[in-house]
Regions:
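Acidic/histidine-rich catalytic neighborhood of metal-dependent amide-processing enzymes
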Residues: 1-67, 71
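A residue-level signal for beta-strand positions that form part of recognition/binding surfaces
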Residues: 9, 107, 162
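Aromatic-residue hotspot detector
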Residues: 12-15, 100, 165
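Conserved beta-strand positions that form and line the central face of beta-propeller blades
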Residues: 27, 121, 164
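Active-site donor-binding loop signature of nucleotide-sugar glycosyltransferases
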Residues: 47, 112, 167
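Active-site-adjacent substrate-binding region
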Residues: 53-157
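Extracellular carbohydrate-recognition regions
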Residues: 158-168
Length: 168
């Protein structure tokens, strides 16, 4: 017995042109919406390498779907119980989750820190791996969250996802 139906598809999408107005994600979300593509959930991960807060990561709570954000919290509590996490707000449509949310898709966004504590070298000449302490350890926490998200959203009624999230 497999974890997923072949009728369902999982996609990993990398966007271009975020910094000039979310153009890449907006184009893809618009195309999916126009084609009536049934998307059960979108997980956005942006800026995952810098640990600027006491907490290990933050879940963005504005311009996101509240139930999906709560689901990410459940995943963190279940699969990374020693991890400290919090919620935070951007105050605007700050990343590629926003075009999905604005079209009625459920999107959630995990971020490297509280919003005001992100990498101070962002978009500068000093925005290098050295700023991250030469390690991807912080980003690995997000990779584990993404794997938990992928697995739990493919389970058929036997995981956290069986609590009714998939039906709204």
């Amino acid at each position: 017995q497999g974890f997923y139906s072949q009728a369902e598809m999982r996609e990993f999408i990398a966007y271009a042109a975020e910094e000039v107005g979310l153009d890449g994600s907006d184009d893809i979300a618009a195309d999916y919406s126009a084609a009536g593509v049934d998307v059960i959930a979108v997980l956005q991960q942006d800026m995952t390498g810098y640990n600027g807060s006491v907490e290990d990561l933050a879940l963005i709570s504005d311009y996101t779907h509240p139930d999906l954000t709560a689901f990410l919290g459940e995943l963190l509590d279940t699969y990374q119980p020693d991890l400290l996490w919090t919620t935070t707000t951007c105050g605007y449509a700050c990343s590629d989750h926003a075009p999905w949310t604005s079209r009625g898709y459920r999107a959630a966004f995990s971020f490297e820190s509280r919003f005001g504590d992100y990498n101070p070298e962002i978009h500068s000449i000093d925005d290098t791996v050295a700023t991250l302490g030469g390690s991807a350890a912080h980003a690995a926490k997000f990779a584990r969250l993404a794997v938990a998200f992928l697995v739990e959203t493919t389970l058929d009624g036997s995981g956290l996802f069986s609590d009714g999230f998939e039906t709204g």
